[in-house]
């Protein structure tokens, strides 16, 4: 058994009889049986793949990658999460049995990374979709940092109390947002259609007259409207 900061057992007698509680016994059994579901979308996941080799050998922590969320109790997200992928990620998290944990790996997963400035389709942080237990910053994080995150998660598991797990499971901490993306095409003369011209902007009181043109040149123009 790997060493943990706090002991799990109350005391050990000379007759090799261990006295403990059901809560500590449950935590001890889950320490060496974290089965992760690997949810990698970009380059950060390549760093996690190096943990499978003999140099780092994450099998010593009892990590057994699973391909089904119903057999996993840990999901490791690595890479950019788009709005189209968000419902699938939430569905995978909801299908995992309880108790379950989440590790957010990389800057793109935590904050959206370099895509969070002007991208309309990037989720600004996976914690807006599912609760995160350990944040692992970096672009990308090193394999040693991934092992450190797993160690910190195991310490958190060793301190858990059964009553706290029940209360946290009753809370609805994850949510989804329906994003509708509409595409309207203008005429080839550079003028928007009549419906768009008749609409008044939400931040201004003046109306746009149908005779006004947004573009003076003749080209094919597309109007993108993102409705939250």
From Swiss-Prot:
Record-level GO BP terms: aerobic respiration; electron transport coupled proton transport; photosynthesis, light reaction
Record flagged with keyword Iron-sulfur: yes
Cofactor, free-text remark: Binds 1 [4Fe-4S] cluster.
Cofactors: [4Fe-4S] cluster
UniProt GO molecular function: 4 iron, 4 sulfur cluster binding; iron ion binding; NADH dehydrogenase (ubiquinone) activity; quinone binding
Compartment(s) where it occurs, according to its Swiss-Prot or TrEMBL record: Plastid, Chloroplast thylakoid membrane
The keyword Chloroplast appears for this protein: yes
Family: Belongs to the complex I 20 kDa subunit family.
Oligomer and partners: NDH is composed of at least 16 different subunits, 5 of which are encoded in the nucleus.
PANTHER family: NADH DEHYDROGENASE, NADH DEHYDROGENASE [UBIQUINONE] IRON-SULFUR PROTEIN 7, MITOCHONDRIAL
HAMAP family in the record: NDH1_NuoB
Function: NDH shuttles electrons from NAD(P)H:plastoquinone, via FMN and iron-sulfur (Fe-S) centers, to quinones in the photosynthetic chain and possibly in a chloroplast respiratory chain. The immediate electron acceptor for the enzyme in this species is believed to be plastoquinone. Couples the redox reaction to proton translocation, and thus conserves the redox energy in a proton gradient.
Protein name (Swiss-Prot/TrEMBL): NAD(P)H-quinone oxidoreductase subunit K, chloroplastic
Species for this entry: Ceratophyllum demersum
Gene: ndhK
């Amino acid at each position: 058994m790997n060493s943990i900061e706090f002991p799990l057992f109350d005391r050990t007698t000379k007759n090799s009889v261990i006295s403990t509680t059901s809560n500590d016994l449950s935590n001890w059994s889950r320490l060496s049986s974290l089965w992760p579901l690997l949810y990698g979308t970009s380059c950060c996941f390549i760093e996690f793949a190096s943990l499978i080799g003999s140099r780092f050998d994450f099998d010593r922590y009892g990590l057994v990658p699973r391909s089904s969320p119903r057999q996993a109790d840990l999901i490791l997200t690595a890479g950019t999460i788009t709005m189209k992928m968000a419902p699938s990620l939430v569905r995978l998290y909801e299908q995992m049995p309880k108790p379950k944990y989440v590790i957010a790996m990389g800057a793109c997963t935590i904050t959206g990374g370099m895509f969070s400035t002007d991208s309309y389709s990037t989720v600004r942080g996976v914690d807006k979709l599912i609760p995160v237990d350990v944040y692992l910053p970096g672009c990308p994080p090193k394999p040693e940092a991934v092992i450190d995150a797993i160690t910190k998660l195991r310490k958190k598991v060793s301190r858990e109390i059964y009553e706290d797990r029940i209360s946290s499971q009753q809370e609805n901490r994850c949510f989804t947002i329906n994003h509708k993306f509409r595409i309207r095409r203008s005429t080839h003369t550079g003028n928007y259609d009549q419906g768009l011209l008749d609409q008044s902007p939400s931040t201004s009181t003046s109306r746009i007259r149908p005779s006004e043109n947004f573009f003076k040149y003749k080209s094919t123009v597309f109007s993108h409207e993102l409705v939250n």
